[in-house]
Amino acid sequence: MSEELQNEIVQELTIELGNDTTFNADILAIKVKNAIREVKMKRNYEATSYTDKQIEKDLYNYYSVIKSVALYDYNQIGTEGQSSHNENGVSRTWVNRDELFRGVHAFVKIL
């Protein structure tokens, strides 16, 4: 599965998050892998005759989407399912996760 793409995104996010004392590279790698799987499902490559190489090339078009979804999911650890969070005067409101997939369109098979 798109290991090169996965590694690139993990490297970038590691640079961004690496100074955080709670940073966990293993969990981040899982979040990136899951984000790639989700984009693959949303694209519905099964409806095409795309080869693995073509799929991987197409996934690079969604690099920023995959990265954003992985980062979103990583940052949601401990607050899963919440749309907002208030604690000690700090207020956070999460965007709807589905918004991150805007622009990812599925292939359809015409019968």
Predicted features by range, described:
Residues 1-58, 97-111:
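Conserved short "hinge" loops at termini or chain/domain junctions
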Residues 54-111:
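Short loop/turn elements at secondary-structure junctions
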